[in-house]
């Protein structure tokens, strides 16, 4: 398995995260993918189920072929995490030969057990870091991604509060940026680049900012309403 660094962008819909992804992907050796509809969450549920049932059963009894949960006592935590990482890198991340930093941005960080999910990602991708992107919530709620939902401003407020609360447990593994700030003055991104250990290239950043990103949102069935 390659010695890659991993960075994940945490945000919500219509926060300007596609632009942020473009900024980060302008760094040589970076390859962050876009959204995957929270696909890693399914792997978290898989792993969490295996670990929970392993802890629940009596290992002496569950190791017997006459037990209804025969074999779950041997659920291999380390192997599971290794295979989950291999699957994610082979399917979702697909790093190029020259990729140094891999990851993705996602807008679906609204689960009640978000701190546990983040801890899982840290197990799967040791040393991974998170960039938490926020935006003026009134502007977010007014976008067509949210206006068809019940209480759009209340929803994005609750999502942001949950992300910020979970981020408190990440310590130095998370860095927050605010869309309105870096669009008004890209120089504020120097702090992010310093935290990442990357060179801030002013010309490259301005080229990205001058390039249109994203597109008008379409209403999608299945997006969670909070």
Predicted features along the sequence, with ranges:
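Short boundary motifs at domain starts and secondary-structure transition points
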Residues: 1, 90-96
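PAPS-dependent sulfotransferase catalytic core
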Residues: 1-87, 202-204, 208-226
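PAPS-dependent sulfotransferase catalytic domain
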Residues: 45, 50-58, 95-202
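Catalytic alpha-helical scaffold of carbohydrate-active enzymes acting on polysaccharides/glycoconjugates
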Residues: 80-92, 165, 169
